[in-house]
Design a protein with these regions (language model features):
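Conserved non-catalytic scaffold segment of RNase H-like nuclease domains
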Residues: 1-109, 125, 129-147
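Short, glycine/acidic-enriched loop or turn micro-motifs at the edges of active sites
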Residues: 11-13, 117, 155
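Conserved beta-strand -> loop -> alpha-helix junction used to position metal-binding or nucleic-acid-contacting
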Residues: 106-120
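Acidic, divalent-metal-coordinating active-site segment for phosphoryl/phosphodiester hydrolysis
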Residues: 148-161
Length: 164
């Protein structure tokens, strides 16, 4: 795949609507040409212990962040016409659909591809698992900031260029 937008969301709690950060990496002609990161005020606005433990974000980090529709207004023109790629895409696609619905925004029916599924299909038992950091390392990307939305989106972009 040569043209796409890799996307990753982190959530504040178990609710798919609680996106608290987003990372986007734009790939055109096989090259990373743009990236975007933003904190987002989650809805509902509370952080579960487990989610914070995973990504390190807290209520203080997003206290003055913009709400999703404001952030998406900046992202949408960047990804116009591009398929979206995520590692474990059902999660990220589910977040996107849920937050669009919650804010009563028209969902553009984005085309999603999953690098986790592609890894399972193409690499199978070559890898001990198909977690993002494992597959990224196999594809030559050193994911040192796992669960930072931008770092995860960049790792996903590296994987997609190799496997999709």
């Amino acid at each position: 795949m040569k043209n796409f937008a890799a996307i990753d969301f982190e959530t504040a709690n178990q609710q798919r609507t609680s996106v608290c950060s987003v990372g986007i990496v734009i790939v055109r002609d096989g090259e990373i040409v743009d990236s975007y990161y933003s904190l987002i005020k989650p809805e509902p606005e509370y952080y579960s212990y487990w989610n914070t433990r995973v990504h390190g974000l807290t209520m203080e980090d997003t206290m003055n962040a913009r709400v999703f529709p404001e952030v998406w207004a900046e992202i949408q023109p960047k990804i116009e016409g591009l398929p979206l790629v995520a590692h474990n895409s059902p999660f990220d696609e589910g977040c996107l659909k849920s937050v669009f619905q919650m804010y009563q925004m028209d969902y553009p029916d984005y085309e999603f591809y999953c690098t986790c599924r592609a890894s399972r299909r193409k690499l199978g038992s070559l890898l001990p698992n198909h977690q993002l950091q494992t597959v990224a390392a196999y594809c030559g990307y050193d994911l040192t900031q796992h669960h930072n939305a931008l770092a995860d989106a960049e790792a996903c972009a590296w994987i997609a260029r190799e496997l999709l």
